[in-house]
């Protein structure tokens, strides 16, 4: 029998109305869980933090609040600079480690993109914590510099 898992809180809140009306307890396949995580990562990366945790260091509760949800502003960084690309990938990794408790051992790397389009691609690898198991996951993230928007999908 293929294992199934309980959906995340967000999936429960946004869940299937038909299942809720029938009183069905939703169980997701690993593929559906991974798709849900990809969606959540995309939402997180497209959210801009009001403050960095460092700016709120004197206020530890605020530093762990929604005020720091998302990524810091990267609009002043150059996509052509290796140092700035590392800064962006580090920012993604820190945001995922700090703000998604389901993910452990998060690694983010810039991928070389040979296409003619102006975009920056990342590879995200982590371990997804699914009680009582862990599942290795991999996602591709693409930053479109003009809009500063990310797209995330399964690798």
Task: Describe the residue ranges of each PLM region.
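Beta-rich nucleic-acid/ligand-interaction surfaces
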Residues: 111-122
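Charged, glycine-enriched surface loops/patches
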Residues: 120-132
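Acidic, low-complexity glycine/serine/threonine-rich segments
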Residues: 68-98, 102-112
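Hydrophobic residues positioned within well-ordered beta-strands of beta-sheet architectures
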Residues: 106, 122-124, 137-139
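A cross-taxa feature marking solvent-exposed loop/turn segments within ectodomains of secreted
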Residues: 101, 117, 132-134
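Immediate N-terminus of the mature polypeptide
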Residues: 1-80, 129-155
